[in-house]
């Protein structure tokens, strides 16, 4: 369905669209100065008037591609990029938003680099139990690879048993500026731990971050923040890789295997994905809590993560869906990249000691969101397979 951030990266609507003649004439039709991307420009101007676009998920149209088509090769119409960037820049100007339109990560795609208003502070919340090697790698990557200086890190200690862990904590303030440790004494409950850490946060934005994350991109914090600051955005997620350079997370899809799954999971790092989805900003119903930025005001207003029904699993998706149900957008950006060493600190949910808890939380999730799991994810066509996250047809 309509995904506003995706439309700012490429004209995914393409050729077939229906709109009122009166509105078309009111807008003056197509603009010659955007020739080559005149349809993209028109869609942006139409949506400025209507607030969105309806979508029919049925297959009603086939595009016969020939050698001169835009899709026939990235050099088929070399003037298209300039026209598209003008259309996007004019759209930002008309809507009163500030940012720079740039070439995207792949030909025929684009990026809006949003200006950040003021100097907002980000509070990074990192739960930890022992595993100081992972935590050290995480912390070092944050300080060595960030172009945003106004942040604090709150390590949330939870029942470590190794004395070396506490000795390690003592070294943090002298090695990492504005880094402190707070102590959560209860049993492991990912939601409660993050909610506890958030009570100490001073920033206008919170970044929930697993201790097994290693930041890769230098504009990591700035990129996440540039979306989180927008009033229409609820949560922002990053592009996460497994250590073997395959995709771990690129947005969350509802309905995968009876619950939810990660878009393009296990695709190669270099893949562009279905219709450039891996290399363009996307709107999804949810993003993973392994790396999730949100406004502190929203986090508090929505009660943080659900400690009762989703102590460990699905709390991130539940939080995002609550935001989405209130009309906020959840965003995946491919320009905030990191490795995710997947749940090293507590073991995978398939292990016997976690299986019962996981199944209980999965049942809670299905009971609450059955309508989206069984019938409807606006960002995943119903003709796509719901057994895998690969955008393959059923």
Each model region followed by its residue ranges:
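Conserved donor NDP-sugar-binding/catalytic core segment of glycosyltransferases
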Residues: 1, 213-259
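A recurrent flexible, glycine/aromatic-enriched loop bordering the glycosyltransferase active site
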Residues: 1-22, 34-35, 191-192, 255-297
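A short, conserved alpha-helix in the catalytic core of glycosyltransferases
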Residues: 23, 33-59, 88, 220-224, ...
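C-terminal, non-catalytic tails of nucleotide-sugar-dependent glycosyltransferases
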Residues: 76-122, 234, 244, 256-284, ...
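Short, well-formed alpha-helical segments that are part of the catalytic scaffolds
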Residues: 131-146
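Acidic donor-binding segment of Leloir-type glycosyltransferases
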Residues: 143-183
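Glycine-rich, basic loop-to-helix element that forms the pyrophosphate-binding segment
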Residues: 184-201
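Short aromatic/hydrophobic "clamp" motif used to bind/position activated sugar donors
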Residues: 206
């Amino acid at each position: 369905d309509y995904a506003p951030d995706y439309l700012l990266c490429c004209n995914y609507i393409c050729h077939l669209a229906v709109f009122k003649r009166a509105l078309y004439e009111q807008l003056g039709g197509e603009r010659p100065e955007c020739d080559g991307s005149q349809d993209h420009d028109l869609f942006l101007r139409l949506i400025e008037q209507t607030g969105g676009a309806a979508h029919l998920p049925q297959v009603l149209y086939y595009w016969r591609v020939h050698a001169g088509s835009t899709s026939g090769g990235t050099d088929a119409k070399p003037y298209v990029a300039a026209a598209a960037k003008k259309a996007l820049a004019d759209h930002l100007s008309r809507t009163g938003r500030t940012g720079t339109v740039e070439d995207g990560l792949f030909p025929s795609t684009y990026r809006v680099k949003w200006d950040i208003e003021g100097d907002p502070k980000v509070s990074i919340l990192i739960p930890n139990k022992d595993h100081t090697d992972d935590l050290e790698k995480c912390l070092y990557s944050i300080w060595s690879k960030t172009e945003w200086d106004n942040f604090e890190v709150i390590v949330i200690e939870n029942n470590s048993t190794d004395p070396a862990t506490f000795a390690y904590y003592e070294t943090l303030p002298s090695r990492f500026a504005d880094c402190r440790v707070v102590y959560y004494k209860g049993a492991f409950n990912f939601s409660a731990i993050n909610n506890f850490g958030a009570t100490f946060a001073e920033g206008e934005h919170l970044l929930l971050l697993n201790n097994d994350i290693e930041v890769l991109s230098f504009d990591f914090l700035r990129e996440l923040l540039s979306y989180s600051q927008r009033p229409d955005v609820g949560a922002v997620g990053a592009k996460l890789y497994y250590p073997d350079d395959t995709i771990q997370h690129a947005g969350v899809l509802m309905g995968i295997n009876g619950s939810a799954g990660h878009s393009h999971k296990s695709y190669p790092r270099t893949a562009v994905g279905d219709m450039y989805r891996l290399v363009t900003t996307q709107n999804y119903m949810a993003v993973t809590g392994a790396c999730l930025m949100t406004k502190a005001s929203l986090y508090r207003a929505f009660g943080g993560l659900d400690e009762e029904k989703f102590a460990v699993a699905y709390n991130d998706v539940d939080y995002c869906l609550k935001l989405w149900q209130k009309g906020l957008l959840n965003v995946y950006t491919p320009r905030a990249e990191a490795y995710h060493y997947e749940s090293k600190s507590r073991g995978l949910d398939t292990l016997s000691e976690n299986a019962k808890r996981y199944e209980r939380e999965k049942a809670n999730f299905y009971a609450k969101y059955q309508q989206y799991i069984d019938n409807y994810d606006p960002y995943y066509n119903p003709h796509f397979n719901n057994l895998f996250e690969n955008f393959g047809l059923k």
